[in-house]
Amino acid sequence: MGLKRVVVIGLGLSGKSIARFLARKGVYVLGVDSSIQALQHCPYIHEKLLETDEFPTQVDYVVRSPGISKDHPWVKAARAAQISVVTDIQLAFQTKEFIEQKSFGITGTVGKTTTILFLEYLLRKAGIPAFAMGNVGVPILDGMQNSGVRLVEMSSFQLADQETSYPVLSGGMILNISDNHLDYHGSFLEYCQSKQNLSLCMRNPEDLWVGDQRFCGRSYWEEVQKYMRLLDKESALKPLYLHDKYNYCCAYLLAQAEFPIAKSLFIEAVATFKKPSHRMEYLGEKCGVHYINDSKATTVRATEKALLSIGSRAIVILGGRNKGYSFVSLLPSLRRFAKSVVAMGECAQEIAQDLDGFPVTVVRNLHEALLCAEEQAIPGDVVLLSPACASFDQFRSYEERGAIFKQLVGMEEVLL
């Protein structure tokens, strides 16, 4: 790289992978975090700095971890000093692993992880080595060490700083778009622009598939609907949620653009694929009441899709930390598919105000929410955890929130 002094801001999972990658390249790494513990537990940094320290001199460039805001004081200081700020995605896309090998990228508001994991599963069933990485849980700078087709899930955080073209992706897809992370991006327009930045990563911009006319690229709707009709004809398949069919068909379309995969193999993959947890995860039935864990639903749009998929009268558990939007748009779906709402956590009162006129009970936490939902439920009802909010008011992650819900329901023993 030729650059010797690099600042890495944020030393979580991705930040550690960035520091490790740079250190192995012989770079002098200056690690920055708000936590002394995080600094102490990262052996790849040469200089430990707290966020309250002064911005150092003689820095070649700055790498911000995906969760670090572009308005972070150190990011602002770097830009004021005309020092380049990049993400792990931009570092990875300059390496020979991406320049010389086939890779795909997926972004969108909802469905990214399911789509990319199904794409990985489908390609492997077809005998094609493939590895999912990025926002899916394996940092891209770690995952790219695997040989084979690289499948990169990219968040708006990772794409927000994309100003330079890194044309390495053979295929790409923007699945969908709806309000999300407005607390981070500041506006819906800026959020959309971060997603559109995926086009800067394409070898050929015409190979970017999009599902919304607000984006530049090839519309995938006609092809995806054709594949969805194919699945509808397969009576041997277990019933699928509408959004799952959509995600699987998007993955198949992306795969088909590069590899000839038989429809029969696609159908077999759909039948045997195990979806990741906390995404419309059916937990079972107790006393005639059905329980679904959709803790991953951290946006209003995701909860709307959950309600549409159920298509029956549900008692919906909402709440957590608001990501910067109103809950009013949920009302049409709630009136159609829900009996009532139990609102919990930091923005429970805000939910009750936005859903004025619809039955809402306000509680403090998830335990109380489940007890309240069970008091209201009768045989045939669905208790749906689909919070439409981030989890950070009371939990470390949506995974922890979902795991505790499963434990409270009594469907799974969980050790946390």
UniProtKB/Swiss-Prot annotation:
Gene3D superfamilies: Mur ligase, C-terminal domain, Mur-like, catalytic domain, NAD(P)-binding Rossmann-like Domain. ATP binds at residues 108-114. Coiled coil: none annotated. Pathway: Cell wall biogenesis; peptidoglycan biosynthesis. One of its GO terms (cellular component) is cytoplasm. Its EC number is 6.3.2.9. It catalyses: UDP-N-acetyl-alpha-D-muramoyl-L-alanine + D-glutamate + ATP = UDP-N-acetyl-alpha-D-muramoyl-L-alanyl-D-glutamate + ADP + phosphate + H(+). This is UDP-N-acetylmuramoylalanine--D-glutamate ligase. It is found in: Cytoplasm. Keywords: ATP-binding, Cell cycle, Cell division, Cell shape, Cell wall biogenesis/degradation, Cytoplasm, Ligase, Nucleotide-binding, Peptidoglycan synthesis. GO terms for molecular function: ATP binding; UDP-N-acetylmuramoylalanine-D-glutamate ligase activity. Cell wall formation. Catalyzes the addition of glutamate to the nucleotide precursor UDP-N-acetylmuramoyl-L-alanine (UMA). It comes from Chlamydia muridarum (strain MoPn / Nigg). It comes from the Bacteria. Belongs to the MurCDEF family. HAMAP family: MurD. The lineage of its organism: Bacteria, Pseudomonadati, Chlamydiota, Chlamydiia, Chlamydiales. One of its GO terms (biological process) is cell wall organization.
